[in-house]
Amino acid sequence: MEIILLERVAKLGQMGEVVKVKDGFARNFLLRRGKALRATAENRAKYDGMKAELEANNIKAKGEAATVAEKINGRDIVVIRQASETGQLFGSVTVRDIVAALAADGIIVSRPQVWLDAPIKTIGQQKLTVAVHPEVEAEITVTVARSVDEAERIQRGEDISTRREDRDAAAEAIAAAGEFFDPDAQHDDEPAAEDDQNAEEK
């Protein structure tokens, strides 16, 4: 389907451009959200009549979006989730979760504005783009952790990837070292010393 864009659409075109897209994308997203018109002769004339107003509205919206982007840009959003010892989440963090976390921080955006290629399924950090306006973007960081303490460690750049096996091995090494230096521990040379003493008494 050929459409006339009423605003800039990422990876598609600028306001006023006539582009060809799949029918489903046009009907379910672009036309429904008022981002485009069908490229008919009637709508071409309609666009020419509303072009000046659209451009004025876009300039105003772009300025407001720039103010919002300044507040969002560089934010680190923390999402707490349960995960395995290896950092694999029991579930995932989706765009819906990120939008909710932003809202809790006083930032209201819609799901289509958050660009996430695939749900987040591991503990750690990921940078995302938030399209505040078709021509204004901001970058945020999403920190996924099992606790607030762990999130702070991740934000400081600490390595939290140590596996349980590694921690167990370290604990065993510490325990072995403690036993080695225990003054009450039985040592192999004690029986020999006792035998020498018995020999002297005889």
Swiss-Prot record:
What are its GO cellular component terms? ribonucleoprotein complex; ribosome
**What Gene3D superfamilies would the database entry show?**
Ribosomal protein L9, C-terminal domain, Ribosomal protein L9, N-terminal domain
Q: Which UniProt keywords apply?
A: Ribonucleoprotein, Ribosomal protein, RNA-binding, rRNA-binding
Region: Disordered, residue numbers: 176-202
Q: Which GO terms describe its molecular function?
A: rRNA binding; structural constituent of ribosome
Q: Name one GO biological process term.
A: translation
**What function does the entry list?**
Binds to the 23S rRNA.
Q: Does the keyword Cell inner membrane apply?
A: no
Ranges annotated as biased composition (Acidic residues): 191-202
Which family does the similarity line name? Belongs to the bacterial ribosomal protein bL9 family.
This protein's record includes keyword Oxidoreductase: no
Q: Supply the InterPro entries for this chain.
A: Ribosomal_bL9 (IPR000244), Ribosomal_bL9/RNase_H1_N (IPR009027), Ribosomal_bL9_bac/chp (IPR020594), Ribosomal_bL9_C (IPR020069), Ribosomal_bL9_C_sf (IPR036791), Ribosomal_bL9_N (IPR020070), Ribosomal_bL9_N_sf (IPR036935)
What is the recorded name of this protein?
Large ribosomal subunit protein bL9
One of its Pfam families is: Ribosomal_L9_N
